[in-house]
Amino acid sequence: MIKIKISDKKIEIRGHANFADYGKDIVCAAVSSIVITSVNDMLTVNKDGVQYVDDAKCVSIMVIQDDDLINKLFNNLKELLKELSNDYPKNVKVESEE
């Protein structure tokens, strides 16, 4: 299961959806696409406004500068991940700390 912790300015993502075999998992692909697209958009707007870390265990996205457009993109990312969790509750769990 993918476990996502969401707070006001930070998102942490861990795990694997286990929806299908590695390389064929549409839920993992959806999470990856949503996160990569959103982070790239935020970095394009203000490369110093977001901290993005992707290591073997966790993906972490944190808003570090107050920027209206970055905040909108970040909030959109949170909503997309919550929607995916609603659609695939056995594979994605969102814990909100807001």
PLM feature spans:
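N-terminal intrinsically disordered, cationic/polar leader segments
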Residues: 1-26, 33-36, 40-98
